[in-house]
C-alpha cells in the first residue's frame, strides 16, 4: 500500500535533514524532553497502580471492611445479632472478635500491641490474614494451647521467633473501674505474621475462646467484623448491618480508618498526570521552534512544490507529518524506556536502597516497605496518544506558515 504523498515528502524532509547534519539542538532537546516526560509518566502511573494493588491485597484483604461494637461492653447477645447481620444484602461474611491492648514481654524487651481474639475457622472466610502467616502455623492455630501469632515487626523488636515463649500483660477487668494489677499470661509464639507493612509492628492474634478466658468475658465478645462484596460502599453496608442488630452499637468502616490512603493515591495519580502532561507539552512546543527553522530551511523546496501545483493543504500536511514524526520518535523512545523501567521498578529501587544503605519506605511508618509497580497497557496507550496529540497541536502553526509561503518571492531570491 502506497504512503500518502504528504507523509512521503515529510519523511524525505526529515531524512534529508539528518543526512545533512542539520539536527538542531532544539530538536534534540524536544525529543529528549518528550521521551523523558512519557517515560516518567508511565513509571509514575505504574507505581500508583502498584500502591493501589497493595492497598487491596494487604489492607482491604486483611482488615475488616466494617466493624460493629456494642455500646455496653462486653456484647452478650451477639449470636442473635450475628444471624441478622449475615442476612443483610452485600455482607459476604461476618465473625465475632475481641479487641484489647496488651504489653508483650520477652526478657528485657517490651512492646505495646493490639491483640485481636479471632475464631480461626471463621477468620479464613473473613480475610486473607491466614495466608500471610509464615509456614503452616495457621493450620495448628487453635484454642486451649496458649498460642499467639505476632507480627514480624513485633517479633524482631522482642528478638523472638516461632516456637519461643513470651509473656503478655492484660488489663484486669473490674466492674468498679478500680486500678488493679494487670493479668500476666505466658503464651507460645505459634506463628509470625508478615504483611511487610505497618500492621507487622503492632498486631497480634489469639484464639477467640482463649481471649474470652483471659479477659473473664464468658461467651461475650467485643464486636462483629464484616466482609463486604462492595468495599467502596462500606459506609452504607455497615450502617445497614448495624440497624438489624437491635442493639445500641458503634459502627465503623475501613474508609474511616484507611480510606485516606486510597484518596491520596487517586489524588497523586491525577497530579502526576497533569504535571507530566505539562512537561510533555513544553517539550512538544519546542517542536514549534524546530519546524519554524525547518520551514525557513526548506522554503526553496516548498516554492518548487507550489510551482508544480501543490495546494495549501498538501504543504500543511507535509509539515504536520514532519512535526508528528519528531514527536512520535520521542514518544516511542519514552514508551520503551517507561515500560522496561516499570516492569523492573521494584528490583531497581531495592538495588538503589542497598547501594545507598537507606530504605525509602519504612514498614513501621507506611503500609508497605517496598515500592510496588503494576503496568497497565491502557495507561501506556493514553500517555502515547496524549503525547502525539500535543505534537500534532505544536505542528499546526509552522505547517500553516509553510502553506502561506509565496513561491514567486522565494524563487526570485527576495
From Swiss-Prot:
Its main location: membrane. GO terms for cellular component: ATP-binding cassette (ABC) transporter complex; plasma membrane; plasma membrane protein complex. One of its GO terms (biological process) is lipoprotein localization to outer membrane. It comes from Escherichia coli (strain K12). GO terms for molecular function: lipoprotein releasing activity. It is a multi-pass membrane protein. The gene is lolE. The keyword Nuclease does not apply. PANTHER family: LIPOPROTEIN-RELEASING SYSTEM TRANSMEMBRANE PROTEIN LOLE (PTHR30489:SF0). Part of an ATP-dependent transport system LolCDE responsible for the release of lipoproteins targeted to the outer membrane from the inner membrane. Such a release is dependent of the sorting-signal (absence of an Asp at position 2 of the mature lipoprotein) and of LolA. This is Lipoprotein-releasing system transmembrane protein LolE. The keyword Transport applies. It is found in: Cell inner membrane. Keywords: Cell inner membrane, Cell membrane, Membrane, Transmembrane, Transmembrane helix, Transport. Belongs to the ABC-4 integral membrane protein family. LolC/E subfamily. It holds the Pfam family FtsX. The chain crosses the membrane at residues 25-45, 275-295, 317-337, 377-397.
Amino acid at each position: 500500500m502506497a504512503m500518502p504523498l504528504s507523509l512521503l515528502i515529510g519523511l524525505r524532509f526529515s531524512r534529508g535533514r539528518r543526512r545533512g547534519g542539520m539536527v538542531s539542538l532544539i530538536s534534540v532537546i524536544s525529543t529528549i524532553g518528550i521521551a523523558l516526560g512519557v517515560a516518567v509518566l508511565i513509571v509514575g502511573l505504574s507505581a500508583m497502580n502498584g500502591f493501589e494493588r497493595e492497598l487491596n491485597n494487604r489492607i482491604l484483604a486483611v482488615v475488616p471492611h466494617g466493624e460493629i461494637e456494642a455500646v455496653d461492653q462486653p456484647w452478650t447477645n451477639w449470636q442473635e445479632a450475628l444471624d441478622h447481620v449475615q442476612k443483610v444484602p452485600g455482607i459476604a461474611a461476618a465473625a465475632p472478635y475481641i479487641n484489647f491492648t496488651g504489653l508483650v514481654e520477652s526478657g528485657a524487651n517490651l512492646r505495646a500491641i493490639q491483640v485481636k481474639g479471632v475464631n480461626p475457622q471463621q477468620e479464613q472466610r473473613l480475610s486473607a490474614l491466614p495466608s500471610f502467616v509464615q509456614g503452616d502455623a495457621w493450620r495448628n492455630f487453635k484454642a486451649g494451647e496458649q498460642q499467639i501469632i505476632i507480627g514480624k515487626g513485633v517479633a524482631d523488636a522482642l528478638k523472638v521467633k516461632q516456637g519461643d515463649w513470651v509473656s503478655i500483660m492484660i488489663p484486669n477487668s473490674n466492674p468498679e473501674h478500680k486500678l488493679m494489677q494487670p493479668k500476666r499470661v505466658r503464651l507460645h509464639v505459634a506463628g509470625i505474621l508478615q504483611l511487610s507493612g505497618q500492621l507487622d509492628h503492632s498486631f497480634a492474634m489469639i484464639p477467640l475462646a482463649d481471649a474470652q478466658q483471659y479477659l473473664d468475658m464468658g461467651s461475650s465478645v467485643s464486636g462483629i467484623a464484616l466482609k463486604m462484596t462492595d468495599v467502596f460502599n462500606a459506609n452504607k453496608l455497615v450502617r445497614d448491618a448495624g440497624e438489624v442488630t437491635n442493639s445500641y452499637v458503634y459502627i465503623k468502616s475501613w474508609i474511616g480508618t484507611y480510606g485516606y490512603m486510597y484518596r491520596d493515591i487517586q489524588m497523586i495519580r491525577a497530579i502526576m498526570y497533569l504535571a507530566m502532561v505539562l512537561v510533555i507539552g513544553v517539550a512538544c512546543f519546542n517542536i514549534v521552534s524546530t519546524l519554524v527553522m525547518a520551514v525557513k530551511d526548506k522554503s526553496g523546496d516548498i516554492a518548487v512544490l507550489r510551482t508544480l501545483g501543490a495546494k495549501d493543504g498538501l504543504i500543511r500536511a507535509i509539515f504536520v507529518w514532519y512535526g508528528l514524526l519528531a514527536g512520535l520518535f520521542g514518544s516511542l523512545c519514552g514508551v520503551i524506556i517507561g515500560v522496561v523501567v516499570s516492569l523492573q521498578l521494584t528490583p531497581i529501587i531495592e538495588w538503589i536502597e542497598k547501594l545507598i544503605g537507606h530504605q525509602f519506605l519504612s514498614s513501621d511508618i507506611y503500609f508497605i516497605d517496598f515500592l510496588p509497580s503494576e503496568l497497565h497497557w491502557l495507561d501506556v496507550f493514553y500517555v502515547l496518544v496524549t503525547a502525539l496529540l500535543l505534537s500534532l497541536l505544536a505542528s499546526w502553526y509552522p505547517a500553516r506558515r509553510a502553506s502561506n509561503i509565496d513561491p514567486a518571492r522565494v524563487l526570485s531570491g527576495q
